């Protein structure tokens, strides 16, 4: 009869995650909870269970769910700027590339982190204090950039005279609606098109509608 293998000594057991790794894991799992249930519907017990630790262990990293929620939104605020690679294209007036890259950046950021859109919606609906800085730094900045671009290109004669702010909202609205339908309502099978196809279609519809017509140029 063979002997029962001895358990691994402590030095050979699976190492515990480092503090920074555990903190990142908590934020990642908490984002999933908040994105599904909102702030009010999520408890520290829910988060600890997702991470696989006790509530007492969770409190070693964060004093409560308010701190976790704020850390998640603060992390999203500090994420890479979507506009940085688009600004040179805008300076050169490369309309199709500007709108295509903007649409792709929005789609890919949400597809890579599905909790992002849900968190933003819940933060606004629940009136969380972090919702305002998130909106100002990420959402409003994007809309203002596009508003200024449409206004400039209209002045240059490339676009017809539309309200720039409404034009910006119309374009962003197409993309965001697509993301909400897929990520919030779960209709991925109904809209399985890859990001490149989605962006190209929306950009064509938008630019065909906003492009200056010959009579607009003559009047200008």
What role is predicted for each listed range?
Residues 112, 119, 129-156, 165-166, ...:
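Amphipathic alpha-helical packing segments from all-alpha helical-bundle domains
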């Amino acid at each position: 009869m063979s002997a029962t293998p001895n358990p691994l000594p402590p030095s050979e057991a699976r190492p515990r995650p480092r503090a920074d790794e555990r903190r990142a894991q908590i934020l990642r799992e908490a984002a999933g909870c908040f994105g599904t249930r909102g702030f009010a519907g999520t408890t520290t017990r829910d988060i600890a269970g997702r991470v696989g630790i006790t509530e007492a262990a969770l409190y070693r990293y964060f004093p409560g769910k308010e701190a976790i929620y704020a850390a998640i939104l603060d992390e999203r605020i500090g994420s890479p700027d979507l506009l940085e690679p688009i600004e040179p294209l805008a300076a050169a007036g490369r309309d199709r590339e500007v709108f295509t890259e903007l649409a792709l950046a929005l789609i890919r950021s949400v597809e890579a982190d599905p909790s992002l859109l849900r968190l933003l919606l819940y933060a606004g609906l629940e009136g969380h204090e972090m919702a305002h800085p998130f909106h100002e730094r990420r959402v409003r900045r994007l809309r203002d950039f596009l508003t200024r671009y449409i206004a400039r290109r209209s002045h240059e004669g490339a676009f017809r005279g539309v309200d720039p702010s409404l034009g910006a909202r119309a374009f962003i609205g197409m993309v965001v609606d697509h993301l909400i339908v897929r990520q919030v309502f779960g209709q991925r099978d109904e809209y399985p098109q890859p990001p490149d196809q989605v962006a190209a279609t929306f950009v064509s519809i938008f630019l065909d509608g906003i492009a200056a017509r010959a009579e607009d140029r003559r009047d200008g």
